[in-house]
Each structure stands twice: as C-alpha cells, then as structure tokens.
Regions:
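N-terminal nucleotide-binding beta1-loop-alpha1 segment
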Residues: 1-17
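A short, N-terminal amphipathic alpha-helix
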Residues: 29-45, 57
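Short active-site oxyanion
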Residues: 42-47, 200-202
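Conserved core of the sugar-phosphate nucleotidyltransferase
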Residues: 82, 109-199
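Hydrophobic helical membrane-anchoring modules
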Residues: 195, 200-224
C-alpha cells in the first residue's frame, strides 16, 4: 500500500487570523504536521491544500508540496471532505500513485511519535477502509429540557469510573482509502476507532489560550 499525507489549511480563520502560520514553540503551526509526515518513512508524499499565499510559502519551505485550493473549497461553509476530494482528484489527474491518504489537521499539531506507525499497521491488516483517532471522555453529559438537567450517560450520584465508556474524535489523524475521499467520505463503513491514551489528544488549537496550552504540553512531553 502507498500512503500520502494531505494537510488542509485554509487562510480565512475568523476567530484567530493567521492561526496556521502562528509560531508554536518557535515553528509555524502548520510545520508541526508537515514535519510529522516527512519524518515517517511510510509516507511517499506530503501535500498541503490551501488558498493562502503565506501558508503556501511556509509549507513549501518546510518541504511540503502545494495543492492550490479553489475559493469554492475554502469558504466558511466549505467542508474538509470537499477540500480532500478536490486534493485527491488533483493528485490523481497529475498521475500520483497512492492507495490511502493520511489526513493531518494543522490545528492538532501534537501527536505521539509512534501513532502514525501504529495506525498504518492497523490499516495494513486489510480489515478497515479507514481509521480515525478518539479519546475517551470522562465527562458526565446531559441535556437541559424545560429548565431541568437530564443526565445522558450516567445517573446522579454515579462514580465516574462506573460510567459507560464514551469516546470523541480528537482529530489527531485520519487514514482513508482514496476511493472514499472521492465520494467526500472520510470515515468509511469499516472505519477503525483508534483510542489515544495520551494527553496530546486533548490539544486542539482554536484560540490564543490553546497555543499557550500546546506549548506547555510540548515541553512537558517533548520526548514522546
């Protein structure tokens, strides 16, 4: 199997302008994902899909190849799946050979060193058309109905360790067959939920405060 990485990174963040090129621990945010991909020998190509000139320049200097993302796939209402479909079709039209795409989100810059190797190992077994990473949630969740809180995954007074396990997508990485991405599907019918038991799974950058937290985590777990 041949694996490539695509990192989608549009330039129009409204909550945090310039987020993808903002320095995290001395390196532009997007470069953390580029370097993670380039460091893995299983990856035969690392691409950044973007509409922003500054992201193109920084990503190219970091060693990634650039896919120009049209405006129709870069607006506020454009989905990651539509951008990935465009990128995959672009590469196919160029004659690039690959079977699976590793999707790395620039806003999830911290990943355990061996996570991608382990994920590819799961895909190589041939039982799953895709894979995505999840964290276990320890939160007691519920709904507010008619002014009253109604527990959803627990009962009042229940200990956290007695709750039924629930999980959420952490965005660290996705692996998907190219045929699914051409249908704008990232998680296919046999997608494997890979549980991440590492604090990096909690880092998702959307605000300045998230950057501060990520820098703390880098220094706290720099050897992992």
């Amino acid at each position: 199997m041949k694996y490539i990485t695509i990192i989608p990174a549009r330039g129009g963040s409204k909550r945090f302008p310039g987020k993808n090129t903002h320095a995290l621990n001395g390196s532009p945010l997007i470069c953390h994902s580029i370097e993670y991909s380039l460091d893995n020998p299983n990856i035969v190509g690392t691409y950044v899909s973007t509409d922003a000139d500054d992201i193109k320049r920084i990503s190219s200097a970091a060693g990634a190849e650039i896919i120009d993302r049209p405006a129709e796939f870069a607006g506020d209402h454009a989905t990651t799946a539509s951008a990935m479909k465009h990128a995959v079709q672009y590469l196919i039209d160029k004659g690039v050979e690959f079977d699976y795409v590793v999707l790395l989100q620039a806003t999830n810059p911290l990943r355990p060193k061996h996570l991608l190797d382990e994920a590819i190992g799961i895909i190589e077994k041939g039982e799953n058309d895709s894979l995505f990473t999840v964290n276990r949630s320890e939160k007691k969740l519920g709904k507010i109905i008619d002014g009253k809180f109604v527990p959803w995954n627990y009962k009042f007074g229940m200990r956290s360790q007695d709750m039924e396990p629930l999980y959420y997508e952490n965005g660290l990485l996705y692996i998907t067959r190219k045929e699914l991405l051409l249908q704008e599907i990232i998680e296919g019918p046999t997608a494997y939920p890979m549980v991440v038991e590492h604090p990096f799974g909690e880092v998702d950058i959307d605000t300045v405060e998230d950057f501060h937290y990520a820098e703390y985590m880098i220094n706290q777990y720099k050897d992992e």
